[in-house]
């Protein structure tokens, strides 16, 4: 199924995609290579389901990794399978010209939400991350996701990545973190021993919260300006008239709007 909301179908709002992750170009080339080589019996729906099953498997593996740390390596395999299902489904639908923009956008991001819930639930059960940190991170993630979906509907801006980080970069970062935790699950901070997942989880939660706040302020201002509820920035002042020998030259302000 497609995850591209830029297509318009039966009133489905067009949205401009913003994807600028570090791996965006390489990922696009890989997906365009994979799409024509995908067996005909595999559909976009199969890939979406594969992505969800992979996240459920990661959740179970995380829950068991507290007692069997080597399972973190299998979590990385699950993340790779999730990337394949979650990223290729839309590309395959567009390649085969069987897009369902509204259905794909809705189901794909609903699956993403359940996937995040499953993975963080597994981490909370593992003992590798405190339940409070996992819950707070999940709340911040959902807050940013809500802002993204609201902006897609009201402004027509669909932000897939934030700065150099998108879904693929987050998977890579999580895989590297799993490798670190496999050998060093705790780290000394301020003279105390803390779980690595907790330290980075708190930092990531703060970053997501700031991103959601900044995006919310920008979106609110953009909508207020569009609907006449907030004054635009004042135009630059016109330069003073300059007197030249043999004539008169008057300056005029330029508008960039």
Show which residues each predicted segment covers.
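Hydrophobic alpha-helical transmembrane segments
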Residues: 2-76, 122-257
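Acidic (Asp/Glu-rich) catalytic motifs at the cytosolic membrane interface
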Residues: 75-121, 147-151, 217-221
